[in-house]
Structures are given as C-alpha cells and as structure tokens.
Amino acid sequence: MSQDKLQTIDQHAPEAEAAPYVLEELRGHVQWLTLNRPRQRNPLSSGMIAALSSAIAAADADPRVRVVVLAGSGPVFSAGHDLREMSPRPGETHDQRAARIRRILDDCAAMMLGIVHSPKAIIACVQGTATAA
C-alpha cells in the first residue's frame, strides 16, 4: 500500500474524525491534558500541536488552574513528530516540502515555548516512550 493511501486512511479513520486530539479534564485546581491518539502512539502532528497549544493557553488564562499535567493515552506518552506528515507529498517540490515542514517545526517550537513560559506549573506524567520530548 502506498504512503499516500496510508495517510488518507489514517486521516479518515473514525478515531481521527471523532475524538479530540487532547482530552481536557479539570480536577480541583489541576488541569489534565491527555494526548489522545493512542493507536498512532500520540504523535506530534499539526493537529496535536494546535490542540495542545490551545489547551495550554486556555489553562494559562483560567484562574481555577494552578497546575497542568500532560499525559498520554495508551502505552506510549508520545512517539514524537508524525513522520507521515513529514513525508513528501505527490507533486510537492523540495521547497514546498521544506516550507511545510518548517511551519510544523515552528508551531511545535512555539508550543514548547508556551510550556516553558507558562505561568502555571506544568508536569509531564510520562509512561512508556517519550521520543523527541
């Protein structure tokens, strides 16, 4: 099966359509953010990065939240960047791919800086693998 067909199948899987990338649960003053793509090992895809960035910003702005805990669903915290998303696309030039990957990496760096500069304590509850974390 070609890489393009695999990517299309993954993007259209029921889990990908229905489930949020990040589960959010406030327990007392602790905001739990759980990466929610266990079948794919919770990769840092564009969607996951955007959802985490948004959830962290919301927790930062919420006066009820004192602590944020990042967790992963399933046996792995995160397998790192989504390599399928980084793969060349049909008809894409080298420069187009480089620009697309640069956007993904820039968004990820901004998310990481959001964690570093958060006014809230952020704790990672890591189980299993945590690649490129």
Sequence positions of predicted segments:
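Glycine- (often His-adjacent) and acidic-residue-rich active-site loop
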Residues: 72-114, 130
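Conserved CoA-thioester-binding segment of acyl-CoA-metabolizing enzymes
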Residues: 2-73, 113
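Conserved catalytic cysteine-centered active-site region
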Residues: 111-124
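Residues that form or flank phosphate/diphosphate-binding pockets in enzymes
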Residues: 43, 78, 133
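Gly/Ser-rich catalytic serine loop of serine hydrolases
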Residues: 124, 128-133
